[in-house]
Swiss-Prot record:
GO MF annotation list: calcium ion binding; cholesterol-protein transferase activity; morphogen activity; patched binding; peptidase activity
Protein name, UniProt field: Protein hedgehog
EC id: 3.1.-.-
Organism (species): Drosophila pseudoobscura pseudoobscura
Disulfide bonds: none
């Protein structure tokens, strides 16, 4: 009877490995009755010997399965990362041809003396105010990074390598632009004639002195290309672009300190989520595997498993947006985070960046009486600076925090595209949950071993990879820059 009960159990799980089936058969063997012809002492000795051998064999099978799990995890990650390259959606085409495909929308060159945006360079909507000149002996000099991109030519007239130094944001945008230039004009490379300047060759108020500006041209010095070069610079994400002269283009960016508050999307650690057990926990205490209240694709509340943390840092200081509703709910979230906004006139639910939610907009809030998600009007939008960031990712891609429905995603202005981009992590989590040795290994952990959530400090490697690649595959209008 025991054997008949065990076989269907293994057959009911078609993905169970041979190791798990072997362990079941070994368990059955371990508990078989000893023959009556054998003496009691011999029987005990034989059974003890069998038990020790079986325990050793089981541990070997568990270790083998764990190795297979690790290899499968690595293989699936590689395959799933390569999979999107084979069918890039039309809306994912970025500057130039974008992953081997020509862009499907027309880009119009700038005209001489045109600037984008049409604002003063030092306004908040452009590159922002000056923060002070950086010299070699300044504390901020260590924040400048060299750019050794082989696809970029640096004139470096001074011979000091100063033209290679710039802020991290400037380097990031310049590398994207270099990629676009090569795709737009094969055989032509981006030329940087000036970056960080320590010789005061510019006006008194110049972002060159802070490493936040570059003067660029093309390697062939063809003036007819410069209008389109300026347009490509806009698409690459520069915060202010000016077709200042027929000889070059001027570009600048916001300071690294001013944009650090919204490069990723997170909640405050003290914000709370409701678990399926009915317990409300701060996000700082949520662990991978917890099932928390989320919102399904139909707008109804569902409980969804936390599969990873896209960002988790309890010490980092960050700027947040505060959304207050007429029902008393308060959501504190980073500016680039996507929030579900209900449009009653259209009976439609959209996802909007938190810093673009306005008063009189409606957000979905959990009704404590019925448990349903109901629209509540936003009555005040504020800002606060607080310590710590936490960004859990659920299988649904949504989470209800402080009773307000929000996305798990940020930076990209599309809930569906962001959810599609994290599909490899959901598949990976599902595969890992099928591994037969996982529960056995977890049960062997001692109480002193901290959880994966407690061990993580910083941005998840996959989320960070997506953030870095977004500028190459998405147009600027799809990004929170």
């Amino acid at each position: 009877m025991d054997n008949h009960n065990e076989v269907p159990m293994s057959m009911s799980v078609p993905w169970a490995s041979a190791a798990s089936v072997t362990c079941l058969s070994l368990d059955a063997k371990c508990h078989r009755p000893c023959p009556s012809s054998i003496s009691a002492s011999a029987s005990a000795s034989a059974c003890a010997s069998d038990s020790a051998a079986i325990a050793t064999t089981k541990l070997r099978h568990i270790a083998y399965t764990q190795r297979c799990s690790s290899r499968l995890t690595m293989l699936m990650t590689v395959l799933l990362l390569l999979l999107p390259l084979s069918f890039t959606p039309a809306h994912s085409c970025g500057p130039g041809r974008g992953l081997g495909r020509r862009r499907e929308r027309n880009l119009y060159p700038l005209v001489l003396k045109q600037t984008i945006p049409n604002l003063s360079e030092y306004q908040t909507g452009a590159s922002g105010p000056l923060e002070g000149e950086i010299k070699r002996d300044s504390p901020k000099f260590k924040d400048l990074v060299p750019n050794y991109n082989r696809d970029i030519l640096f004139r470096d007239e001074e011979g000091t390598g100063a033209d290679r130094l710039m802020t991290k944001r400037c380097k990031e945008k310049l590398n994207v632009l270099a990629y676009s230039v090569m795709n737009e004009w094969p055989g032509v490379r981006l030329l940087v004639t000036e970056s960080w300047d320590e010789d005061h060759q510019h006006g008194q108020e110049s972002l060159h002195y802070e490493g936040r500006a570059v003067t660029i041209a093309t390697s062939d010095r063809e003036p007819s290309r410069y209008g389109m070069l300026a347009r490509l610079a806009v698409e690459a994400g520069f915060d202010w672009v000016s077709y200042v002269s027929r000889r070059h283009i001027y570009c600048s960016v916001k300071s690294d300190s001013s944009i650090s508050s919204h490069v990723h999307g997170c909640f405050t650690p003290e914000s709370t989520a409701l678990l399926e057990s009915g317990i409300t926990k701060p996000l700082s205490e949520i662990s991978i595997g917890d099932r928390v209240l989320s919102m399904g694709s139909n707008g109804q509340p569902v409980y969804s498993e936390v599969i990873l943390f896209m960002d988790r840092n309890l010490e980092q200081m960050q700027n947040f947006v505060e959304l207050h509703t007429d029902g008393g709910a308060v959501l504190t979230v980073t500016p680039a985070h996507l929030i579900s906004v209900w449009h009653p006139e259209r009976q439609q639910l959209d996802y909007v960046f938190a810093d673009r939610v306005e008063e009189l907009n409606y957000v979905l809030v959990r009704d404590p009486q019925t448990g349903e998600l109901r629209p509540q009007r936003v009555v005040r939008v504020g800002s606060v600076r607080s310590k710590g960031v936490v960004a859990p990712l659920t299988r649904e891609g949504t989470i209800v925090v402080n009773s307000v429905a929000a996305s798990c995603y940020a930076v990209i202005d599309s809930q569906s595209l962001a959810h599609w981009g994290l599909a490899p992590m959901r598949i990976l989590a599902m595969l890992q949950s099928w591994m037969p040795a996982k529960d056995q290994l977890r049960s062997s952990q001692t109480e002193g071993v901290v959880s994966r959530a407690e061990q993580q400090n910083g941005i998840h490697w996959y989320a960070n990879a997506l953030y870095k690649v977004k500028d190459y595959v998405l147009p600027k209008s799809w990004r929170h820059d």
